[in-house]
Curated annotation (Swiss-Prot):
Gene Ontology cellular component annotations, sorted alphabetically: cytosol
Superkingdom: Bacteria
Location within or outside the cell: Cytoplasm
Species: Pseudomonas syringae pv. syringae (strain B728a)
Signal peptide: none
Protein name: Leucine--tRNA ligase
């Protein structure tokens, strides 16, 4: 065994062994417990970042631990390879997205392998390859024929920079999530998944996921947004509208109906179109509204604007005429594109009515009283007893709901209804680098799905996009085809699918990635699925995780899987943060500086007191810790860390610095500390191994000192097992090993018993660290005399008898202050402990002249004597 810890050699040897032995390639083994651990697959952006390292290390620790429990563990990896960044990079570098993507995959795969991940690379999937997306197209055609996918014109978020449609979730503060461009509204034909047909199940089956963070489930519940309310009809005022009919609105607060003072409609509503005839000002306002975002979150925060029309509707219960307004806060695609406005009890209506001088009529007595003066108070929206509501005055919320519902039903002007905030998922993208939509447009036959024997519709990979819309729409050699039904000349669909489609089912393909008879091989899929542990960032709580749950139910209904949910347990890892530094330019712009280019000055307590740019020695501003990013220039290259310290050091730091679900603050000194610890482990093992083999341990013959050492070993096993296996607190598991190391480093190695005990101790360190620092553990286990690799060694079981103590050392306090210790038999009663404490020399000294009022005994820990 080499005297010095040499991570480069150790890690290369371990990885070569795993590769040659195909250690992590698995197959179905009926009768053996399985564990499917999956971290969200990466986009091949070019290089790993520390977020990747943390994500995949967490998954690897869990996978290796479960393997040591004797389970058949699947941990696959692949590439979420379609998407706009590849197109943008291709435009910038004049290279085909396929070439850029495959080169990035090769480089990043090498980086991932250098981390020593226990991944079954034989199951690698790449979503931009035809052998993957062929099955996506296959499922698309089946769902299209069933009506689960349909085509219609829709108002969409159009990104003018990326020249594509964005889902509502991809619009942030009115801007595209990737380009940052202001979003426009457009009407175009699109393909939609009918996710709303599964809204109830998606909502209710969240209760079947106890292993998911409550925060994620709440976010999904809110996004699905089921609400019970009423559809209310406001009859048209025929004198102003010129025809019979009624305006339909949905409300969750029918109890406030008597407080409605106007109605508001979306810019696209037929009444808005009617009112705009001959009204240029109103038409201009409608056009302005149509240019805004269709994302509900943006509408909620934007300035409320409106235009009056000359139209009126009638209140369904009183017959009072209510004016019709066109308002930018009403969405055509939500509800019926119209709202009944009750300004006294709805914040948006209140803001709008205040701005335009519309009546505000309180009809609910709230904790704020009977009036609703400006500014808006949250109390105005409370449920309460009705006031100013005619025959309904005095009723509470539910009684008022029921009574007003009955009155409306009697007049055929209302009915109960359940509504969802969730909208159908529009998946058409006017981009090149995505999965082609397998539809042919025929003048005679309409939209015809491509037959299974003609799949896949292959995306040409030699295209270099220029950024002006979809290249496929300008490629006759791609879109010119014959109709599969009638054989007439037809046109292939040139839109591609939203890349969230690929990531909605990849976890299932891993179960049988080479299967050519379908999307999944059912036996393999049902052997491995659902995923036991899924790991990824909370930023995917709504988009990816909701879509994957939806897809799993689609696959279940197609008979491909039998389970209802894709992921049993979900761990949302925290971000990796690092210090930021900048200089403020005269223009007010911040120029960010890489931490590696900054020299820090610290005080005696290691607190940073100044920062200077190394190159010129002049001060820079300290910006605080923020998520590692290219824009802030505070990212750390994982490859640099691996080359300098080794993968085990990086893995250890990532697991020790913070619990996995919390943010981690990068620290160079923390990395160095992790490296020093591994050197200590190596030195201890090297010193032990150098003395030659040890004899077996005679537990019955252990001295008290040796029992204490063995107790520390088994306390570490018990606690680390709980920390890793139950709590997923890898940082405290590492802390247990560090505590054990402190004991072992002081332990004597004089007798055969000492050496046998040290053998057990060092073996335990190697085993407990094996999931976290697998390379050094691999080498230590071999050097400790074992023929089988540590990955095939079982997780250590603690010996309960080793934890039993004959005697305990208890802390003695007088009035809460430490005054000494006493040693007592472990079996001593509370009375015996108190009696011993009362006659302790220090207790007598510090209670001299005082009266003991109370004795508090905390069993096994301390005695506190209260005296005055």
């Amino acid at each position: 065994m080499h005297e010095l810890y040499q991570p480069r050699e150790i890690e290369a040897a371990a990885q070569t062994f795993w590769d040659e032995q195909k250690s992590f390639e698995v197959s179905e083994q009926p009768g053996k417990d399985t564990f499917y651990c999956l971290s969200m697959f990466p986009y091949p952006s070019g290089k790993l970042h520390m977020g990747h390292v943390r994500n995949y290390t967490i998954g690897d620790v869990i996978s290796r631990y479960q393997r040591m429990l004797g389970k058949n563990v699947l941990q696959p990896l692949g590439w979420d390879a379609f998407g706009m960044p590849a197109e943008n990079a291709a435009i910038d570098n004049n290279v085909a997205p396929a070439k850029w993507t495959y080169e990035n995959i090769d480089y990043m795969k090498t980086q991932l392998k250098s981390l020593g991940l226990a991944v079954d690379w034989s199951r690698e999937v790449t979503t931009c390859k035809p052998d993957y997306y062929r099955w996506e197209q296959w499922l698309f055609t089946r769902l299209f024929e069933k009506g689960v996918i349909y085509r219609k014109n829709g108002t969409v978020n159009w990104d003018p920079i990326d020249q594509t449609v964005l889902a509502n979730e991809q619009v942030i503060d009115g801007r595209g999530w990737r380009s940052g461009a202001l979003i426009e509204k457009r009407e175009i034909p699109m393909y939609y998944f009918k996710i709303t047909a599964y809204a109830d199940e998606l909502l209710e089956s969240l209760d079947e996921l106890p292993g998911w963070p409550e925060q994620v489930k709440t976010m999904q519940r809110n996004w699905i947004g089921r609400s019970r309310g009423m559809e209310v009809q406001f009859p048209y005022d025929q004198a102003s509208i010129g025809e019979a009919g009624a305006l339909k609105v949905f409300t969750t607060r029918p109890d406030t109906l008597m407080g409605a003072t106007y109605v508001a409609v979306a810019a696209e509503h037929p009444l808005a179109t009617l009112a705009a005839q001959g009204n240029p000002a109103l038409q201009a306002f409608i056009d302005e509204c149509k240019g805004g975002s269709v994302a509900e979150a943006d509408v909620a925060t934007q300035e409320k604007k409106g235009q009056a029309t000359s139209l009126f509707v009638e209140h369904p219960l009183t017959g009072e005429k209510l004016p019709v307004w066109v308002a930018n806060y009403v969405l055509m695609h939500y509800g019926d594109g119209a709202v009944m406005a009750v300004p006294a009890h709805d914040e948006r209506d209140f803001e709008f009515a205040t701005q335009y001088g519309l009546p505000i009529k309180p009809v609910v007595r709230t904790s704020a009283g009977d009036q609703t003066p400006a500014p808006w108070q949250p109390a105005y929206g409370e449920h309460g007893e009705l006031i100013n509501s005619g025959e309904f005055t005095g009723l509470t919320f539910q009684d008022a709901f029921d009574a007003i519902e009955a009155a409306l039903v009697k007049k055929s002007l209302g009915q109960s209804r359940t509504q969802f905030r969730l909208r159908d998922w529009g998946i058409s993208r006017q981009r090149y680098w995505g999965c082609p939509i397998p539809i042919v447009h025929c003048d005679t036959c309409g939209d015809v799905p491509v037959p299974e024997d003609q799949l896949p519709v292959v995306l040409p990979e030699d295209v270099v996009p220029d950024g002006a819309g979809s290249p496929l729409a300008r490629m006759p050699e791609f879109y010119e085809c014959s109709c599969p039904k009638c054989g007439a000349p037809a046109k292939r669909e040139t839109d591609t699918m939203d890349t969230f489609v690929e990531s909605s089912w990849y976890y299932a393909r891993y179960a049988s990635p080479h299967y050519e008879g379908g999307l999944v091989e059912p036996n393999a899929a049902n052997h491995w699925l659902p995923v036991d542990q899924y790991i990824g960032g909370i930023e995917h709580a709504i988009l990816h995780l909701l879509y994957a749950r939806f897809f799993h139910k689609l696959m279940r209904d197609e008979g491909l899987v039998t389970s209802n949910e894709p992921f049993k347990n979900l761990l949302t890892q925290g971000m990796v943060n690092a210090e930021t530094y900048f200089r403020m330019e005269t223009s007010g712009k911040k120029t960010w500086i890489n931490p590696a280019d900054v020299t820090l000055e610290r005080d005696a307590k290691a607190k940073v007191i100044s920062a200077r740019l190394t190159s010129d020695g002049l001060p820079v501003e300290i910006g605080g810790t923020e998520k590692m990013s290219k824009s802030k220039k505070n990212g750390i290259d994982p490859q640099t860390m691996i080359d300098q310290y080794g993968a085990d050091t990086c893995r250890l730091f990532m697991m020790f610095a913070s619990p996995p679900d919390m943010s981690l603050e990068w620290s160079d000194s923390g990395v160095e500390g992790s490296h020093r610890f591994l050197r200590r482990v190596w030195r201890l093992a090297q010193a032990h191994v150098t003395q030659g083999p040890s004899t077996g341990l005679d537990v019955a013959a252990l001295s008290d000192e040796q029992k204490a050492i063995r107790r520390a070993i088994h306390q570490a096993i018990r606690q680390a097992s709980q920390d890793i296996g139950q709590n997923q607190k890898f940082n405290t598991a590492v802390a247990q090993v560090m505590t054990l190391m402190n004991v072992l480093e002081k332990a004597p190695q004089d007798t055969p018993q000492d050496r046998a005990l040290m053998q057990e101790g060092v073996e335990t360190v190697a085993l407990l660290l094996a999931p976290i620092t697998p390379h050094i553990s691999h080498e230590l286990w071999k050097q400790l005399g074992h023929n089988e690799p540590v990955i095939d060694a079982g997780w250590p079981a603690f010996d309960a008898s080793a934890l039993v103590q004959d005697s305990l050392q208890l802390v003695i306090q007088v009035n809460g202050k430490l005054r000494g210790h006493i040693e007592m038999p472990a079996s001593a009663s509370r009375e015996e402990v108190e009696a011993a404490a009362r006659v302790n020399e220090n207790v007598l000294r510090f209670t001299d002249g005082l009266t003991i009022r109370k004795v508090i005994v905390v069993p096994g820990k301390l005695v506190n004597i209260v005296a005055s």
